[in-house]
Amino acid sequence: MTAYSPADSNAEARLLSGGSDPISDTENLLDLAYEVGTSSSDNTRYDRESENDEEEIGVGWEDTTSSSLNKRMCKSATFHDFCDDSEYSRRPVTTLHEEDFDEEEEDEFEDASDRRNLDEDDVEYEDEDDEDDIVVEEEEITPEDIEHSPTGVTTQTTPPSNNTSKSKKKKKRKSDEEDGLRKMKKSSTFASFLNMFVSRRRSGRDSGERLMSRSTCMLRPSISLSVVQESMILGSDGESVEVSPCTSDQTPTGVPPRYIVNVKMRQKTARKWSEEEIQKRLSLPADLRLPVAVVDKLNRTPTLDQPLTRKNRRASLSEIGFGKLETYEKLDKLGEGTYATVFRGRSILTNKFVALKEIRLEQEEGAPCTAIREVSLLRNLRHANVVTLHDIIHTDRLLTLVFEYVDRDLKQYMDSCNNAMQMNNIRLFLYQLLRGLAYCHQRRVLHRDLKPQNLLITAKGELKLADFGLARAKSVPTKTYSNEVVTLWYRPPDVLLGSTDYSTHIDMWGVGCILFEMIAGRALFPGGTPTEQLGLIFRTLGSPRPDRHPTICEKPTFYPYANRHYNPDPLCRQIPRIDAHGFELLMKFLQYEGKDRVSAAEAVKHPFLRTIAVKCCHLRDEQSVLEADGIHIERELLASDHHHSSRRHHRGTLVKDKYRMHSSHHT
């Protein structure tokens, strides 16, 4: 055994310096716990064996007075028991079940320390009281075990092992050594209480230190790291000012300043946004051209440079003037329907014409479902062959949809050219119609109301799908929809028979009817009622056959037509100027079974449209087909031209007849 260390002596002296109540000074107890835990291996333990070994310690028991002996023994027992109880506190906690831990045993453990302090003159306890005596088994603790603990005192404490002594032997101790041993027992009881008190105080602090050590262990000093932020501040020499994020050596988080990354500030350069960048950033339509004054105003808006959120986007659009009724001027009325009225207007922002679709809001029902569908679908469709929704204005009584203005539709276009369109223009319009439908079908949007009145034709010759009031998104799996869709002339036979289970093929039948009308100049199936419409279809295409058209023939509404047999009337006789490829594509559109109809994506690759598809296959969705090389609209022979041509032909005939009459008379 080695000699008793002076560090241990100082720690013991600090423990006993508090007088009769050493618990009052909490800081001294914590310091003592740290000294015990951080002592090196050279500071060896001091136990009862070292007290009794006169040769190793160097100080004999007989060299000291009786009072100093008692004080020294009391002091040694206190320090030893403190370390001994630290060893107990490092042991795992044994959790007892509620049924195993009796309240009577808990009271016995709490009152154990009081019973150890009984004087030697106390009366002898009864047999049932002798069972409450608790003797603490003290184990030795080595300095190596103490060094493994970070603080010397752990946060978990376990009650000392209870060995109930049932011995009835009560002898009076007469020697000073026996008296000192009894005081050592008292000190041992106090050490247990002291250890429990310190452990409870240390439990909260250790948890905070573990969190702090867990956070600081991830920090490493690095010279190569640097963060550059933008600022308008420059130094006196014209260079950027290097700013430290902390003004003192002590940071708020307790991290040393050497771990803080240096932040260099540089001058912020004002970025100027172009019109195309603003349109892309604010998701504006491609055909909407902002004036120069509006672009300059947006460049001065601080929200444009900030990260784009929904709130910042709305703020920027409001700065421009979107969402405000005063931005648009109402001019004249274009048409009126069940729920809405369409006006021609002018945008004060861009000084261009727009179409204002005013939807009346009922006080109880609110906005009609057709308007909600149209808004929800069009706001996500951005294509050159789909009409563009510019703005939405909501008031108490009206919901105004602002569209791009197109002055005529396909029906008006066919009437203007006396229903005799150029074949090149027919191919070009059909390709644009299929291109827009393929875009919508790819996004699982069904138009469900295709007709020439809903296909807008611009002055350049661009075709745009419009009036998505009956459109809806197709869900997966296929849902049942209403059969009261599509104008009667362009409604497929399965829908006429009451089918509500359909998909994108509902639009392809209407494409075939529109193609025939552009070529022939008249409607293919102009029925007045659903029954008359089905009769026209069966007489033209022939009666459905159960082996080839089971979906049609199994419908209960088909029974009145089951006994009627019609032979098909070849359509090629009605449209003689169409070629074989065009007629083949037309018949692929007009199929009884919806699954047999060609899709829009397949139709654009058909040989009838190959010359246009080759030149337009590289275009983006937002680009018009007229931007491709070699694609243009041919000049149509208008109705006025037909009238003037007939008058010239009539005048020429009169001149010839007059010349013949003059010649014969002269003869």
Swiss-Prot record:
Cofactors: Mg(2+)
Keyword Magnesium: yes
CDD domains: STKc_PCTAIRE_like
All copies of domain Protein kinase, residue ranges: 328-609
Disulfide bonds: none
Gene Ontology MF term list: ATP binding; cyclin-dependent protein serine/threonine kinase activity; metal ion binding; protein serine kinase activity
Entry EC no(s): 2.7.11.22
Statement: the UniProt record of this protein carries the keyword Transferase: yes
Keywords: ATP-binding, Cell projection, Cytoplasm, Kinase, Magnesium, Metal-binding, Nucleotide-binding, Serine/threonine-protein kinase, Transferase
Catalytic activity from the UniProt record: L-seryl-[protein] + ATP = O-phospho-L-seryl-[protein] + ADP + H(+); L-threonyl-[protein] + ATP = O-phospho-L-threonyl-[protein] + ADP + H(+)
Biased composition (Basic residues): 644-653
Amino acids binding ATP: 334-342, 357
Cellular component aspect of the GO annotation: axon; axon cytoplasm; cyclin-dependent protein kinase holoenzyme complex; cytoplasm; dendrite; nucleus
Ranges annotated as biased composition (Acidic residues): 99-111, 119-144
Task of the protein: Serine/threonine-protein kinase, which, in association with cyy-1, regulates the trafficking of synaptic vesicles in the DA9 motor neuron and probably also in the DD motor neurons and in RIA interneurons.
Protein name per UniProt: Cyclin-dependent kinase 17
Organism: Caenorhabditis elegans
